[in-house]
Amino acid sequence: MSEPKTASERYQKISQLEHILKRPDTYIGSVEIQEQEQWIYDEETDCMIDKTVNIVPGLFKIFDEILVNAADNKVRDPSMKRIDVTINPEENFIEVRNDGKGIPIEIHEKEKIYIPELIFGHLLTSSNYDDDEKKVTGGRNGYGAKLCNIFSTEFTLETADPKNGRKYVQTWENNMNVCHPPKITSYKKGPSYTKVAFKPDLSRFGMESLDSDILGVMRRRVYDINGSVRDVNVYLNGKPLKIRNFKNYVELYLKSLEKMRKMDNGESDTTPSNIPTILYERVSDRWEIAFAVSDISFKQVSFVNSIATTTGGTHVNYIADQIVRKVSDILKKKKKNIKPYQIKNNMFIFINCLIENPAFTSQTKEQLTTRVKDFGSRCDISSDYINKIMKTDLATKIFEIADENANNALKKSDGSRKSRITDYPKLEDANKAGTKDGYKCTLILTEGDSALSLAVAGLAVVGRDYYGCYPLRGKMLNVREATADQILKNAEIQAIKKIMGLQHRKKYEDTKSLRYGHLMIMTDQDHDGSHIKGLIINFIETSFPGLLDIPGFLIEFITPIVKVTITKPIKKVISFFNLPDYEKWREEESHKYSWKQKYYKGLGTSTSPEIIEYFSNLDTHLKKFHALQGDDKDLIDLAFSKKKADDRKEWLRQYEPGTVLDPTLNEIPISDFINKELILFSLADNVRSIPSVLDGFKPGQRKVLYTCFKKNLTTEKKVANLAPAVSDYTAYHHGEQALVQTIIGMAQNFVGTNNIYFLKPNGAFGTRATGGKDAAAARYIYTELNKIARKVFHPADDPLFRYVQEDEKTVEPEWYLPVVPMVLINGAEGIGTGWSTSIPPFNPLDVVNNIRHLLNDEEMDDMHPWFRGWTGTMEKIESQRYRMYGRIEQVGPNTLEITELPARTWTSTIKEHLLLGLGGSEKVKPWIKDMEEQHAETIKFIIKLTDEEMTKTRKLGFYERFKLISPISLQNMVAFDYRGKIKKYDHVHEILKDFYEVRLEYYQKRKDYMTGRLQWEAEKLSFQVKFIKMIIDKSLIVTNKPKKQLISELEELGFPRINKEGKPHFGKIDEEVEAIISEDEDEDLEESEEATRKKDKDDESTVNGPEELFGTYEYLLGLKIWSLTKERYEKLLKQKQEKETELENLLKLSAKDLWNNDLDDFLTAYEDFQKMDLFLRNSAVPKTKGGKRKRKGGDDDDYDPSGKKKPARRIKKIKKEDDFDRILIKPQAKIKAKRPVKVKVEPPSSAASTPSVKEELGVSDVTSNASTPSTTIFDQKVKQENSDESGISAFSSKFNKIASAFDEDAPLDQITSEDTSVKESSAPAAKKKAPPKRKAKVVESSEDELSDANLSEQDDEEVVPVRRQRSSRQTAKKSYAEPIEISDEEDFIDDDEDEEVDSDESFNDE
């Protein structure tokens, strides 16, 4: 044994040179051969190859240090142009030479040796030790070239400087242990240069020679220098490299990627190459980046100050993270389950950057550790660069990988064929499911639990062996773009997979591996039910390829939409599975029977016995879906893919209204289902969101107006009560809260809302401050019809419309036809499925002018967007684009006043902007000195700025800085046309023309209808006269005679039957039909009036009969006894003459005359509306009573029956037209034809010297919202050329006489001939029950007509007069005004309004 070492022997002190040689891994890395993945340059293919090599990292490092020194010289001397590298493996010799400024050849003042010897032969010497100096070179620690000297057997330095005339050559040997004296010679001519030549000490690296692996890595490093150092020519072994820039360098790698791809795919080298796209960008002088798609994993090639950072670092993370984050934000919009690592793993990035004073993990400098904030520069990836990345196949590769991962995850939840499933308590499993006979079983999927109970009832018929049931909760998930996580968390999808035994993405050719071989869908027969069917089809086609190719796999169970019960002459039930078939039967066959109908909106409407009946007749109720064919897959994708939004828009536009699925088909093609049934779901969403071009309404608005018209809402009604009334009368199915918001929107009158509001905002309906979001709760606010409503929607048109059928009810019309196109006057906005719309509002007077131009076959004038009460400026910047400006002016040296905002820019929005400028934030410095609000009914902000901010604001522009500019576009004007098809309008004139054509057609229809009605009325009166005359003359005996005989005599005498519409029917009818009519009449006689009302109220379905078509003789046989008097006979003759006169007057008018008359009435009403609107908006006290009621009761009590009512506060009655004129109506001046944003705002003192807008800008084609017609409706009062005594006023007086004189229910002994002459009575008080609403009628009526029992029961009509044609046509430019008197009943707040408001009597009385 050797003797133990002493302490002195154990602890040694060695020189730094010895330390480097003994522990080289600290300085140059390992000196042993290692296997590494390295990019090497392959001369044969002229590209970089990712190869596994065996190299000594330390040997490569000493070579790299000399190269980096040469590259660093480019930073010190930008004039450097060339680097020469020579590698001679035979002689183990390497040389690196660079031109440019050389090393100073002088003696160091302190160390007393030459500086070249100090730098290359002495450790810890460098020019990089001054940390206050920011450098972008590779050298940092003072080792560099000295390490190369230490690990070489011979190291020679040569540098020359012609400026000082010297050349310096010095050699070291034996690992820098032997230093030969320098040789300094004269050097007068030639370039400056530095050359280092060395022979590495291969014995220290365990090598005998420079092998191919190390040579390949060294050559690649030379190419690195060529690509990363700009404007330098690099030569290798005397040959110039062809690389000219960093982009050329990157291409060497992409060639390799293409070669690797060919190898992986088994392609030959002759196969055409598809080199990946290079996305190169030089961001700045310090940053160059390039991007390509990687095939395998994340790859990077990066350089910091010419140093190859082979393991990356903070600079690589800095760039990669930006790309990943921005690409992820885009991809997540398409596929939400994308993870950042999935993006990064498909990226190959190249970075060449200059970093100030870089820090690395070690002397080997393979990884940068400098923090981003210390880089000395930024490299922000632009959006354009990201967009270029998105155009590569990066997204495709990411989605493919994500889909593969998702599929693997989804397969974990696959089902299997097993006989029992215990995870789903609601499953009614078939006994044979999961057995060898499972493919014969059918799973019934029902829409909800209620439908499940009905399906279970049906199992009693078909048995439980081969049928099972399971309920769906709500709608299925659209799996086409859903993430794997969403699908895995969707309980319905997972349940179906388990119950059916489905396996994700398995290609099915038959169903023998499933628990159930058939899937049956049992949903409601509505649009939502169709959508559920479509989602299930989409789910199967997306997740289980092949299943839809199997005939009979997918089935649907259909139920009737309407059932007709025939009661006479036979008892029979007819089921209809679509509405067109029902409507056809109703038109062609219904007159033969007495019948009633029942609508089945959902499965819940059917009873258990009916379900049993359905299951007993499966041939009728089961419909198989045809196996996939043709373009079915494309159609499914069209219906459910987010990528097909534009195609889906066109698909919806081409739909022809009335197209339905043929119910007689036994097999339903999926294409037919999508194009004829599923499409209705998307259309229904558009119908709710996009208005009709004819009335400008969406269905909710139309339903509200219909209810108000139907109930004659002339006294205010609480919104909380009106909403349920609308829901009840129109069968609204989307919740009362939605109706509340619709009502509030229709009544809002602040600037930016309706140009004409048809409901009065009696209460807090919202303000301009928040755009109406500050409206009070529905239980505190009231509304009623505005008087202008019936001047826009003329009651004479009501009988002409086609009304919608909902839940056994005839509800609102498909569309109204206003006198003027409200879609232009109030505008419209909405977002539907595939379509959206934005139609700005226009001035009603401009619209009327253009209608009259069309009526006169003249060219239309241009129209510009217009907002009631708005005083800003509207500038036309393009044919279909405008810009709205608020109003701002300078009122002091540094004081500004904002007095108007762009329309529909709410006060709160501007206030937030101003407060941010006043208080500032983390990102915004305060720039407003002070701000005051002085709003009343108008806008007023007072803003004070500093001198500096005032100057800055002038440069930026007042309108821009205060956000007083807002765009408005006419490029997305979409509406349903008169055919019910979606149409995009390119110009407002197109909208007006479409409206004009239909409206004019309907004026002709109105005339035809009124003509026919007058003729029927005249004929009816003639037959009544004839009937009474025959009874008086006793030529016709009606007493003590069988009814059948009497009717036969009336037929022989030529008396027609008259139906409820007033149409006569002459001649005999079938005996069976006559028997039904007679029996129905007998039943009516037996029932008391009270019982009849109760029956009508309680029965869901109305009994219909042939009398609807043929009519009855009630107009004759139902006459009161006193009608047989001589006075009544004479009165009827007079009435007949009046009808004939009215008919003559009507025939003299054309359709255009009728429209012009309505326009005259509209303009008069619009003048009154403007006055009323201004009065309401300027009223200091809003009309609301919710506060009082809230104080009387609890928080939520609207009415306290125990409390004593107090009389409502009254507003002084307005009796004179001058009362409105007391409100100062300032005409709005036309805005100058200049862009206000350019106007230099000066204080008032200099206003006189301020150049005009026109002089300063020279801009024209600016329209003003504030402009008015040359003759305004407020500047003068013009009496009408024709007195209203011949029109409405006279008619109203006569109607009031009749209404007050006759009571339909009065006993005969209380009615005498003297009653025919009565005095005019005043209108009933507000608290009294209003008379029943009556259908439109054209002419003046007499007392006798309303006394008829026939008309009392059947013709609930409001009579509307035909106005005489005016002697000279009124136009929109000439307005008419008439005095306004508001009686007690029309007061803003009535004495008895509390009683009226709390009563629903008017809405429940039918």
UniProtKB/Swiss-Prot annotation:
The protein's annotated catalytic reaction(s) are: ATP-dependent breakage, passage and rejoining of double-stranded DNA
Bound how, and how many: what does the cofactor note say? Binds two Mg(2+) per subunit. The magnesium ions form salt bridges with both the protein and the DNA. Can also accept other divalent metal cations, such as Mn(2+) or Ca(2+).
Domain Topo IIA-type catalytic intervals: 690-1159
User: Which UniProt keywords are listed?
Assistant: ATP-binding, DNA-binding, Isomerase, Magnesium, Metal-binding, Nucleotide-binding, Nucleus, Phosphoprotein, Topoisomerase
Tell me which cofactor or cofactors this protein depends on.
Mg(2+); Mn(2+); Ca(2+)
Q: Where is this site: Important for DNA bending?
A: I831
Q: What's a Gene Ontology MF term here?
A: identical protein binding
SMART domains tied to this protein: HATPase_c, TOP2c, TOP4c
Give additional notes from the record. Eukaryotic topoisomerase I and II can relax both negative and positive supercoils, whereas prokaryotic enzymes relax only negative supercoils.
Q: What is this protein called?
A: DNA topoisomerase 2
Task: List the source organism.
Answer: Candida glabrata (strain ATCC 2001 / BCRC 20586 / JCM 3761 / NBRC 0622 / NRRL Y-65 / CBS 138) (Yeast)
Source taxonomy lineage?
Answer: Eukaryota, Fungi, Dikarya, Ascomycota, Saccharomycotina
Name of the gene encoding the protein in the UniProt record: TOP2
